[in-house]
Amino acid sequence: MKKIIYLLLLVTAFHTSCKKSSTEGGTETPTNPTTDLPAGAKDGVAFINNGTSAIVTLYAPGKTSVLLIGDFNNWSTTASIMKKTRDGNTWWIQIDNLNPSTEYAYQFYVDGKLKVADPYCEKVLDPDNDQYISAAVYPNLKAYPTGKTTGIVSVMQANQPIYTWKNNSFVRPEKNNLVIYELLIRDFTTEHTYASTLAKLDYLVNMGINAIELMPVNEFEGNLSWGYNPSFYFAADKYYGTKTALQNFIDECHGKGIAVIMDMVLNHSFGQSPMVQMYFDGSKPTANSPWFNVDAKHPFNVGYDFNHESAATKKFSKDVIKFWMQQYKIDGFRFDLSKGFTQTQSSGDDVFRKYDAGRVAIWKDYNSYIKSIDPNNFYVILEHFAEESEEKVLADDGMMLWNNLNYNMNEATMGWLTNSNFQWGFYANHGFSKSENLVSYGESHDEERLNFKNITYGNASGNYSIKGNLATSLKREELAAAFLFAIPGPKMIWQFGELGYDVNIDFNGRTGEKPIRWEYYSDPNRKALYNAYTKFIRLKKNNSIFNSTSSTYSLAGGIKYIKLVEGANTVIVVGNFDVVNQTANIDFGSSGTWVDASGTNISLNSNNYTASLAPGEYHIFSKVALR
């Protein structure tokens, strides 16, 4: 009898051990032990023992098993079983015998069926898109582990190349004096790299630009993208260059007096995100996702909508914010689709844009967190477009709001006057107490190029035609720019707007690559527009009157003017946006000599200025000569 019992025990033990030694196609998920996180652990990878060991963690509540696979265990799906914390939310493992100078590719193997990269990794390898990144753009890129795994893999390295910062005393421009240049690395130079963009930096410096707003540069899906389809938030997208190349770009900008603002997309993520993939039913996020809503809460969403009231989302977003502030020394964020940071359901913008106390609380919390990291004039810019009462609360908290003047300003440049009033550029019309909180622009990446519409749809009268006439359409751009830069507050330019870029936004698809037209700079008419921008920017930055809190204006009709008063000086910008001669009749406030920024003077016998202005003619008058 004892022999029979012993034999049964032996068979049972053998059968059990066979079940536990599953392979990648095994029949049973391995058992994961439960234990607390060790000291020094953090989300993602924490290196210890001088880089010869790493503690790797993954936040994945509700999962039954997680294994770590990678170069260090020959991608075995049985060798590195991760431990689970007692609350069941976080998985971790320590791996040893690493070479601190070696890059190791790795993934998480979740529930015996899903391989995902590390959401906190600083570099990924993409089997589909890396092949199109040249060695000139990204030297010595680690090869993808073909044949050993599938999907995007993360990369860890203890002794990463360390960038030594040179310009540590950079002082950010005051918000009111910001002249921001919105820039897409992909379409700025043919090489589409940080290095090639740096080679053009003096072009921006000479124009007077003091801030560059980079369209998204963290890892996004594919290579040829605007970047608003993010997948990995801590990894710089390799299509533009290496991590140190981006750090050097920012450092060199600081050395030239230029702040760098990063376009950050935390409203949503896309399907390559491991955070999406881990809680996904094949068509949408599942209800137990720690980060995402099953269905988007608002009508403007693309990708998968973050649940912005989730504690997990808030922690992740703050980790992303802190990382870029500290690792890359950026000077500000432009938060894409900030109005989407809501859990209030809406199906149309009439509801979506209404005052949302929950959304306000979310943004005040993030703004406070940013200030706790860097209180030194760090820029928080929102693409919000919500109800004015909500934007005022955010502005009063120190945040800056995008202000789109494209439609009305373009109507003015085309000479169609009915809807040409762009008084929305003045902060008081938003209820704001300070002009520094309103970032006004005539063009952005999202809007049609002014000069395309000038040439295609411009008005005409007699021998004066905007449509089809490049020289005239460019002068209309100059006219509008004189007014834009006279409005108090920070301003933004979309790349090549200063040269009258006139390629349709929908050419090659809205987000598709656009022709890079550096030859514009050699065209005398386009160069004249660049020179005019340079002049207007210089006037704005050198003369505090352009931030005056005392302003009057008339921006409807053909004759438009802006009047600014500061102390003993008055500036009046006047121009004719009609396509026929018009007579200006404006109260200048005093008689005597007035200085035209063109270099000539006029003398008034009374307070009134009366003059016939030709189509497109403008003047910048001041009582005291401007610098």
Model-identified regions with their sequence ranges:
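Surface-exposed beta-strand/loop patches in extracellular or lumenal glycoproteins
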Residues: S53-G62, V66, F577-S591
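Substrate-binding/active-site clefts of carbohydrate-active enzymes
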Residues: V124-S134, Y138-A143, P161-L178, L184-G358, ...
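Conserved alpha/beta catalytic core and glycan-binding cleft of carbohydrate-active enzymes
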Residues: K329, D356, W363-D506, K541, ...
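Aromatic- and carboxylate-lined catalytic core of secreted/periplasmic carbohydrate-active enzymes
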Residues: P488, R517-S554, P615-E617
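Aromatic-rich carbohydrate-binding modules that target alpha-glucans
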Residues: P38, F47-N50, I55-E103, D111-Y132
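C-terminal beta-strand-rich structural cap/linker in extracellular carbohydrate-active enzymes
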Residues: V66, N605-R627
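Bacterial Sec-dependent N-terminal signal peptides
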Residues: M1-I4, A13-V45
